[in-house]
Amino acid sequence: MNFKYIVAVSFLIASAYARSVQNDEQSLSQRDVLEEEESLREIRGIGGKILSGLKTALKGAAKELASTYLHRKRTAEEHEVMKRLEAVMRDLDSLDYPEEAAERETRGFNQDEIANLFTKKEKRILGPVLGLVGNALGGLIKKIG
């Protein structure tokens, strides 16, 4: 009779130990997941700050270009540059409120079309901005030189 109790108690102790080991493993894996999520949040925060600084710099450069072209007579080419600059400014402003812009632009699209739309929008914004800034700097250097 004592042998049965010893076996039963040993079995209960072994199963309790196995459960505690399993719980420890789960808590460690959950802790690892939480640490990874926290790291990703930090990286996203840094990326957001860099993007915000870049947007501010681009807006400042675009406004400076606009004020340069605003106070004098413009050629047809400069008028076209101004139109593009205004479009870029609107796109940059829409980046400040991506949820609203996404709702307006993506109604009725599936997820693949949405991803393609944002990729195209990023290319559409960055390409002309870099071109405009390069052209403006080139024009200013020619005038100074």
UniProtKB/Swiss-Prot annotation:
GO terms for cellular component: extracellular region. Expressed by the skin glands. Residues 1-18 form the signal peptide. The keyword Electron transport does not apply. GO terms for biological process: defense response to bacterium; defense response to fungus; killing of cells of another organism. InterPro entries: Bombinin. Coiled coil: none annotated. The modification Isoleucine amide is found at I144. It is found in: Secreted. Transmembrane segments: none annotated. Residues 19-43, 74-124 form a propeptide. Keywords: Amidation, Amphibian defense peptide, Antibiotic, Antimicrobial, Cleavage on pair of basic residues, Cytolysis, Fungicide, Hemolysis, Secreted, Signal. Pfam families: Bombinin. Maximin-3 shows antibacterial activity against both Gram-positive and Gram-negative bacteria. It also shows antimicrobial activity against the fungus C.albicans, but not against A.flavus nor P.uticale. It has little hemolytic activity. It possess a significant cytotoxicity against tumor cell lines. It possess a significant anti-HIV activity. It shows high spermicidal activity. Belongs to the bombinin family. This is Maximins 3/H3 type 2.
